[in-house]
Curated annotation (Swiss-Prot):
Positions bound to ATP: V56, S57, D58, Q59, T60, S61, D62, V63, V64, K78
Lipid attachment points (N-myristoyl glycine): G2
Amino acid composition bias (Polar residues), ranges on this chain: 1-12
Compartments where found: Cell membrane
Species name: Arabidopsis thaliana (Mouse-ear cress)
Name by which UniProt lists this protein: Probable inactive receptor-like kinase BSK12
Amino acid sequence: MGCCYSLSSTVDPVQDHTTDASSEPRNGGGEDPPLTKFSFSALKTATNHFSPENIVSDQTSDVVFKGRLQNGGFVAIKRFNNMAWSDPKLFLEEAQRVGKLRHKRLVNLIGYCCDGDKRFLVADFMANDTLAKRLFQRKYQTMDWSIRLRVAYFVAEALDYCNTAGFASYNNLSAYKVLFDEDGDACLSCFGLMKEINNDQITTGSVNPENVIYRFGTVLVNLLSGKQIPPSHAPEMIHRKNVFKLMDPYLKGKFSIDEANVVYKLASQCLKYEGQESPNTKEIVATLETLQTRTEAPSYEVVEMTNQEKDASSSSNLSPLGEACLRMDLASIHSILVLAGYDDDKDIIELSFEEWIQEVKELQDVRRNGDRAFVEQDFKTAIACYSQFVEERSLVYPSVYARRSLSYLFCDEPEKALLDGMHAQGVFPDWPTAFYLQSVALAKLDMNTDSADTLKEAALLEVKK
């Protein structure tokens, strides 16, 4: 049975639904933009029966597909899980609210589908991928510092507009919700504005405007570091590193330390590190606006990055390690890492004589005990030994992080495994093993699209070696 409620404005689904994503904010006058009521069959046709090949995001139980309408235009279609939005009237009312929003930094919501227990949203399609892909799965070109500053500013503008329009909360704000339009400019996905508030969320405070500020802080940490950091670990990244250690190694010598310090301080405030008071959206916009010194920063570089990656997307045969990671065969991965030993570390870490003197025998014994436990598949002991080694050394072999990462995977702790894969990448930025292990951890976390992208990047790095 179809939904019994309809919005006041509907448009024939075959008409052109492309809207100007660069339009200025709506003023008080004029008519509200219409929302199209799509049939389930129309969306099914647009996505080729919701083919996995058309999935562009599966970060949560809600999946986003790329669809093509009868007029040839592309759209993004979000499919909610069957447990969401049980009240169709509430769903339509909220879709109507979001559909009225128009801002040059916000992706337009253009339609919906409410068919039985099925719920869908339809938005303009952004052709140049997400910030997450630009930062975490980059292959050839590092995102310029000036572009990162513009991304932060544009997202802050979008959040401030939404807050002013009465949308104080945003569902799981992250680098995956920041999209790039055809001009290479950053826009915030409108899908995150659709939140079904239940009594449990109200009680726990999970729907809280301050959550948006915190999550924006994690995006700032992403932009500084170039790394995928779970939101719960973002304060730890700020706490353990100064701005020099946090910065993306690919940006070395290519950024302003004064500007980076401003972003670092703002991220600390958003994450409430050391009890700092969180800024509001207008204060965030004002701070980031002062950093927009390169208004001519070429957004087309983002478009060029996309084109380069499409040219390089033809995957070659995977190595034995790549095949094992694709199969998520932990036993085979273990055998390969044991056989490799520390060979890959030789070109990365060369201890000076003074460092060798400081490397006391007891600490080396701790690592050897960890290695012995790792070989014998006593992974809890390996984790304990490697953790002690990591805590007492300023410079850690990337293979230690790799071995602890795999140990965490065996112990069913994929989030910690992902962090260690990132730590290994931080020491050795172009090490395929670090990316391979991250791909397995991402798959364990049900982040399948990101896992596939990371696996592909590892394979490309392996070819370049």
